[in-house]
């Protein structure tokens, strides 16, 4: 058994839901595709203003995800977010969420939930996963001018390590979710994570 050695996560796509019952339908499809009865981390995916007002609230998706947790079908209920800080605060305050997933990196310091999002999530007792820590590869292959600015500090390290170090220095970040396209990427990230220290 692999199941007792891994955490499984999946997401609920509000934008393709035509009625409230689609929430449970997509959840059951996820469980079947993964081959598990319980999903550890399940989140309402890509909350933004339009989806919040047109689907999440009217379809009572928060009540539905919390019911899955009560039934033991998921262990942790959360959301991923792509909008402004004001809406982020509203979503955080709307339910007893366990976690959230936001885009954050040193280039997007004030983008979406921004640098204040992690603090707000933690103040509300939530775990925080950060996506796009290397901004879809941009921060892993910096333009020469950006690389020169970083090296002017007297510290010499690969571009990716600058991006990951920035996040690992934010105490509210529980995990950084890095897009990886190969086993070599996975191994490189694991190597660096195993030796990382606070800046």
Regions found by a protein language model. Give the residues of each.
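Conserved, mostly hydrophobic/aromatic
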Residues: 8, 30, 39-42, 77, ...
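Short catalytic-loop micro-motif centered on adjacent basic/acidic residues
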Residues: 75-79, 101-102, 175-177
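Acidic, His- and aromatic-enriched active-site or binding-groove loops in soluble protein domains
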Residues: 65, 97-111, 154-155
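Active-site groove signature of glycoside hydrolases
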Residues: 32-52
